[in-house]
Regions:
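Short, flexible loop/hinge motifs at secondary-structure junctions
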Residues: 1-229, 302
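Catalytic center-proximal scaffold of phosphoryl-transfer enzymes
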Residues: 2-8, 14-24, 53, 60, ...
Length: 546
């Protein structure tokens, strides 16, 4: 449009110039020169127009390219943002994987068996041994002064007596047959051993019949309870089969083989299975009494662990004291299973546990957290660069030492000033921890992804009194080791004999295991109480003294 307007103005100017020249200039020479100048001017104008058109095209091309570059930049910015987000996710995933790979039995709740074979040697000067959670006691290894110990002691009346005669005279080599015996110089030694043959003892029960001399009625005696068949195994064999399978975790077939090798009794696996089922059915009253006793205890340790039951993940729950143990099996881990077990809903004492959240729903109970779990988690946090964790570990261990010293001195609680100092130091460590984790305190109430160390910090902050319950109440243990040791048998059972095929089978197993564990804690021999159970008279637990 501009070029056409310019060409129009140029032609108009040329016409006017021509008119002016025609009117004003009559010289042919001047007219020719003027025409030449006008042609040159026209050529310059054309060249200019051509340059303008070229530059206009270049500008349009550059504008299109700029638009394309803008689109490319926008796409690249979006791609960069996506890559940065993916990088952040990958970095978080790598950190989480490193954290998982760094967990072992020392800095988490993983069992020692999960550590694998890649363990550093105990004495390796090239590698610094990792810090142990235990502190030196200052005592020498072995038995301590005043410890009674345990050893074989001679008996007054041995079962057998074997005399060893000298072959000949040690002085001259003469025959000593019929020579005088000198008892003053004799020495005797006793050997405790199994009998050469462990055979079954067959007892024949006869129901004697008597005829009354007065009326002529024939009366028969009654067989003992449990003697029902013409030929059967007795309660001792029943007890041995149940003991081997339930307490020693031996599979049914291997238990059968062991009984045969020891006694010669060729029992079947079906018989042992039936004996375990019979034992569980006979413990209904025992289980209810055990539950009631646990509900009345001042302090009970609780724990739970996963197990393979009926081809899926199930859960074994335990409630333990120094004298009582109760196991229950359930498909769930949380409050549904705890309600079904029946102890926590009626328990008003101190519940010691690992801090699993469903325990907190039982508000009528007093709660205490396991310091052993805290020490392991603090060690993991320290390995992740959280220096406050080391200070908290030292504080917990020092507090436990003070409690043990106070117990040894016959005290029932720490002095008020020591408790005040303990809580002040505790809060100081928590404050240091928040300084090393900025922004955590402000967002503590929000549901967001946090590291294990941050979750531990929030738990220690929000549940301070539960974490330090052991310092206020000397009945409360420092750790939940009692429950962890009791429930460890679940892992042993799975390693040795495998999982439970049915839900009912797991429940029966746990009931019999509760019976054996409680009996052992109260000084009873498992074989004896199992034989008593097989005879139809279940042993009943006694409440804790005091």
């Amino acid at each position: 449009m501009l070029a056409e307007a310019e060409r129009g103005s140029r032609s108009g100017a040329a016409n006017l110039a021509g008119v002016a020249i025609a009117g004003c200039v009559s010289s042919p020479r001047l007219s020719a020169e003027l025409e030449v100048l006008l042609d040159e001017r026209d050529a310059l104008i054309a060249e200019r127009d051509e340059l303008i058109e070229g530059q206009t095209a270049q500008i349009a091309a550059m504008e299109r390219r700029l638009a394309e570059l803008g689109d490319e930049i926008e796409v690249r910015d979006h791609t960069i943002a996506q890559l940065e987000a993916q990088l952040g996710q990958l970095q978080a995933a790598v950190a989480e994987l490193r954290q998982r790979l760094g967990k072992n039995s020392r800095n988490s709740s993983k069992p020692p068996s999960s550590d694998g074979l890649a363990k550093p040697p105990a004495n390796n000067s090239k590698k610094k041994n990792k810090r142990s959670l235990r502190r030196r006691s200052g005592r020498k290894p072995g038995g301590q002064p005043g410890h009674e110990g345990a050893r074989l002691e001679r008996v007054e009346v041995p079962d057998d007596h074997v005399e060893h005669e000298p072959d000949c005279c040690e002085g001259c080599g003469g025959d000593l047959q019929g020579a005088e015996r000198v008892e003053e110089g004799e020495e005797s030694r006793q050997v405790f051993d199994l009998p050469e043959e462990i055979a079954l003892r067959v007892i024949e029960h006869v129901a004697v019949c008597r005829c009354c001399e007065d009326c002529g009625t024939v009366s028969a005696g009654s067989f003992p309870e449990g003697v029902r068949a013409p030929v059967q195994y007795g309660p001792g064999v029943h007890a041995l089969g149940v003991y081997l399978h339930v307490f020693q975790h031996i599979p049914y077939d291997r238990a059968r083989q062991l009984i045969f090798d020891l006694t010669g009794a060729d029992v079947s696996t079906a018989s042992i299975t039936a004996w375990v089922d019979q034992a569980a059915r006979g413990l209904t009253e025992f289980d209810e009494q055990l539950r009631q006793l646990l509900c009345k205890e001042p302090v009970v340790n609780f724990d739970e662990t996963g197990a393979r039951i009926a081809g899926r993940l199930g859960w074994i729950h335990s409630a333990s004291t120094d004298t009582l143990t109760r196991y229950t099996a359930h498909a769930k881990r949380g409050t549904e299973a705890m309600d079904n077990a029946g102890v926590l809903p009626d328990f008003e004492g101190v519940a010691v546990h690992d801090g699993y959240k469903p325990y907190q729903s039982y508000e009528q109970a007093i709660h205490a957290l396991c310091s052993g779990h805290h020490l392991r988690e603090l060690l993991a946090a320290e390995e992740q660069g959280q220096s406050w964790a080391s200070a908290m570990s030292c504080l917990l261990l020092d507090s436990n030492e003070q409690v043990e010293q106070a117990k040894a001195a016959g005290l029932e609680a720490l002095a008020a000033d020591l408790l005040a100092e303990l809580h002040a130091c505790y809060r100081a460590v928590i404050a240091l921890a928040y300084e090393q984790n900025p922004g955590l305190a402000a967002n503590a109430h929000k549901r967001m992804k946090r590291t294990d160390a941050q979750n531990l910090l929030l738990r220690l902050d929000q549940r301070e009194h539960e974490a330090l319950r052991f310092a206020h109440d000397f009945r409360v243990p420092f750790t939940n080791n009692l429950a962890e040791q009791d429930i460890r048998m679940v892992k042993l059972q799975q390693k040795i004999s495998g999982s439970w095929r049915t839900d009912e089978g797991a429940k029966r197993y746990m009931r019999v295991r509760s019976y054996i564990s409680t009996a052992r804690k109260q000084g009873q021999r498992p074989i004896d109480v199992l034989a008593q159970l097989a005879s139809g008279r279940a042993w009943m637990p006694a409440p804790a003294p005091g």
